[in-house]
Structures are given as structure tokens and as C-alpha cells.
Amino acid sequence: FISPLRQLANIYNAIQAALAGAERVFEVIDTAPETEDIPGAVGLEHLKGHVEFRNVDFSYEAGHPIIKNMTLEALPGQTIALVGPTGAGKTTITNLLTRFYDIDGGQIRIDGHDLRDIRRAELRRALGLVLQDTFMFADTVMENIRYGRLEATDEEVMEAARLADADHFIRQLPQGYATVLSERAANLSQGQRQMLAIARAILADPGILILDEATSSVDTRTEARIQQALLKLMKGRTSFVIAHRLSTIRDADQVLVIKDGEIIERGKHS
């Protein structure tokens, strides 16, 4: 009598798990494809990194604005720090710059070109991202770094790791650069994963850099090492930095305080 009931309970659990998985699959299937480049879209040869937001409006849902009439300018090589409470719109600003979403009004310009007039593939190649939680593949350390520029040589990969202050810990791994990481690099510390992410960005050599809470999940000692690697990465590049820690934003050329999708204060840290 008990055995059929157990089987029924197991079947019910399996069905529930399958439904949850199916829901995620349908979300992917229902995702709208990105719009194609317009005819005559331009490239970004000789990128300088001059970024402008001109009266930009954006909402994920109609009638619920997230970014409101935002105007900002980053000159080539400048570092712009975006600070503010959670949900203020900081990450949305960088999502608009990468053109993960199209704006509702206003203009975003890079080197004088409207973002919508730039070939999307070239725009993405010009941008480098270091996020709070960077995805790593179940592959070797070498190939995970090479993902930043697939045609890079082994020597270029190792040089990027040296600049990111990652070479030392990599060589201490069981097979060095040939060490295979587990899914999402669970066999590395958070700080080590961030150093690999920085090495990946250095290898990509982007003209514009986006750092989204890149040091928020590490201890202060590890943060100091990562911060030094980030300074090398940011040198000469237009950079947008989202952070709460003072150490990350104190050298920024501009600090923009964001609240409810608007810039409520701007200046330099002093």
C-alpha cells in the first residue's frame, strides 16, 4: 500500500521540477530577438571613447520610467563613478550604453555617432565589462582568459594574466594555465575569479570599460590587489564604475549620484 504512494509522490516531484525547467525554457524561446543594424550602420575605427547621454529616457515597462531626462558626458580617458541606492538606475545606464536595451527618448552618442547608427557587433567589441559575478566556463584557465579575444596567442593570454596580477596564483594551480575549472569556477575564490575576469578584459583591449561592483564581494586585502589590477586596466580608457566602496571611486574624474533614475548631484570626491 505504501510503495504506490511513494511512487506517486516521486512522480509528482518530478513533474514539478520539469514544469519549473520548462518555464525557464519558454522564457528563452519567448525572448524577442535584437533588432538588426540599420542600413549603412557605421563602425568604430580609431575609437576615442567620448560618450554622451543627451536627455535620455528609458523604461522597461510603459508608464514606469527608470531613466529620466538624463544628460552626462565622459571625455576620452575619463573615469565616471555612478553611486546611489540599489534600484536607482546605475546598472540600467550601463545596459543602455551596451545597447542591451534601446532608449525611449534622447540620444546616446559615442565619438559623435548615435548608438543606434553603430554596428552592434563593433559596439560590443569596443566595450569591456567586469561584473560582480563574472561567468567562467568549465574549461582551462587559459581558454577562460582567451574568451576575451579568441584569436589571442598563449603568450598574449599569459601577459594579460601578469598585468591582472593573476599569473602568480595561476602557476600555483595543479596544472597551471592548463588547470580545468569547474562550472562557474567554483574551485577558485571570488578574488581569483575577479582577477581572471580582469585578465580577460585586458586581453580584449576595449576602448570603453564598465565596472559593475567589481570588488564588492571580496575582503579588503584582496580588494587592494584587484584595485591595482583595475587601475592598470582603466589607464587611458573611458571607464564607468558602479561601486559603493570609497576606494573604488575616490580617483574618479566625475562622481554622479543617481536617485530614482535622475542625476541629483555631480562633482569630484574630496
Where do the model's predicted regions map?
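Short cytosolic juxtamembrane segments of multi-pass membrane proteins
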Residues: 31-32, 184
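ABC-type nucleotide-binding domain
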Residues: 37-40, 44-270
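Cytosolic ends of transmembrane helices, especially the final helix of ABC transmembrane type-1 domains
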Residues: 1-28
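Signal-transduction coiled-coil helices of two-component systems
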Residues: 15, 32-35, 233
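Conserved E/DxxT/N motif and adjacent residues on the DHp alpha2 helix
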Residues: 27, 34, 146
